[in-house]
Regions:
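A structural preference for short, pocket-lining loop segments at secondary-structure junctions
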Residues: 5-50, 65-75, 94, 98-102, ...
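Helix-loop "lid/cap" segments that line or gate small-molecule binding pockets
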Residues: 134-135, 186, 190-192, 206-212
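CoA-thioester-processing core
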Residues: 62, 66, 76, 82-135, ...
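A short acidic, glycine-rich active-site loop
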Residues: 46-60, 206
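Glycine-rich phosphate-binding loop at the start of an alpha helix
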Residues: 39, 56, 60, 83, ...
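C-terminal long alpha-helix characteristic of the crotonase
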Residues: 96-101, 152-202, 231-235
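Well-ordered beta-strand positions
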Residues: 93-94, 133, 137-139, 145, ...
Length: 235
């Protein structure tokens, strides 16, 4: 379950992996897992009178960190995904799942009033009608259905899952890391607001400026002209 201790450890691991030589991260459960994650640790939800999903809730913290993390994060899913864990993987950049995986949003089983940020994290990719069905029924959907409605990027057989995901991560890792980081941030900002305010625009422009002033940008141009594979170094 997504206990505070588990999420603290996960956030620390992500912080430790935020190094220039790391280009892509895979979020996964142990191989052979029947349950990818059971979602919130129910024992840690507060009693009546307190918001169970406040701004500082561990789930809110990890979803923000995943969304704002400067490197692509791939969720490699084997087993069933429940509740808050579904939102957590929806916050990642790509989701690759085994064909036997299932996905459930279960707050209404517990009477939990899911918050606006969490709903937004789901509707940004899945669409309102799909999210309504998932939440209103709390029924699991198959990986095949999740792929068909745009929740997943790929569905593969379980025995091929790790190799397929590693190949995807390796492919991403060969690209320009600074450009990927700024585009990920652009997509996050655009996904969170209907309009972009002037401060955000200037900040993004500054990030883009740092990319096209970088050695990697020049290396990419040179490699294209010279018809060779670029060697990106991250500065």
């Amino acid at each position: 379950a997504l206990s505070k201790v588990f999420i603290d450890d996960l956030m620390q691991a992500l912080s430790d992996l935020n190094r220039p030589e790391i280009r892509c991260i895979i979020l996964r459960a142990p191989s052979g897992s029947k349950v990818f994650s059971a979602g919130h640790d129910i024992h840690e939800l507060p009693s009546g009178g307190r918001d169970p999903l406040s701004y500082d809730d561990p789930l809110r913290q990890i979803t923000r960190m995943i969304q704002k993390f400067p490197k692509p994060i791939i969720s490699m899913v084997e087993g069933s995904v429940w509740g808050g864990a579904f939102e957590m993987i929806m916050s990642s950049d790509l989701i690759i799942a085994a064909s036997t995986s299932t996905f459930s949003m279960t707050p209404v089983n517990l009477g939990v009033p899911y918050n606006l940020v969490g709903i937004h994290n789901l509707t940004r990719d899945a669409g309102f009608h799909i999210v309504k069905e998932l939440i209103f029924t709390a029924s699991p959907i198959t990986a095949q259905r999740a792929l068909a409605v745009g929740i997943l990027n790929h569905v593969v057989e379980v025995e091929e899952l790790e190799d397929f995901t590693l190949q995807m991560a390796h492919h991403i890792s060969e690209k320009a890391p600074l450009a990927i980081a700024v585009i990920k941030e652009e997509l996050r900002v655009l996904g969170e607001a209907h309009t972009m305010n002037s401060d955000e625009f200037e900040r993004i422009q500054g990030m883009r400026r740092a990319v096209y002033d970088s050695e990697d940008y020049q290396e990419g141009m040179n490699a294209f002209l010279e018809k060779r594979k670029p060697n990106f170094v991250g500065h």
